[in-house]
């Protein structure tokens, strides 16, 4: 009798749903603005609400190198937030599944205010030292560096490049339009940086899924489509357009 009781008890306990990691390597505003704060956490909250907890999405903050290591595993089963196919070696969208856009963004060219650079095309950067972030890919920039038309010098963080720019150690860097005001409005940089009136590029941000998650792909696309029309989500985005 006792055996049947324990068997009934075991079967009556609800099975724990699947948890999937949402990787994010953007360790700067607006995506991460402090402990347990930032747009990435808002995204996780929104996705979990729309998915009804099945599966449950869990945020994992990593650097670009760690993400590359995780994704090199053939059994990789996570999602990656805020990325573009061109950055992930998948311009034709053949290696991974991609959600509809969840954000539209730009790359803004920043230079020292004492030596302002206006971006009018790749030739604007010839002979300059460009400050990049380790592991990041830059359309147009990387090709020019490969041809020897400019020098790419990497740092670990966006903020480090802005500090190097102020000190004259590099000539230009790129900051995403979504992040720009978080840095430029800082007292530390005020009046010291020049923003080109023309962005270096514009692009869309997506959620990457492995090919094995076709079951989730359609659901995330439905959510991404809703996000674009959801006033509540637009209000969240708007709240991260300036300095916290």
Give each language-model segment a name.
Residues 58, 65-78, 158-179, 186:
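Short helices/loops that flank or line small-molecule/ion binding pockets
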Residues 79-92, 171-201:
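A ligand-binding cleft/hinge motif common to bilobed small-molecule-binding domains
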Residues 41-50, 113-116, 128-129, 207-240:
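Extended ligand-binding regions for polar small-molecule ligands
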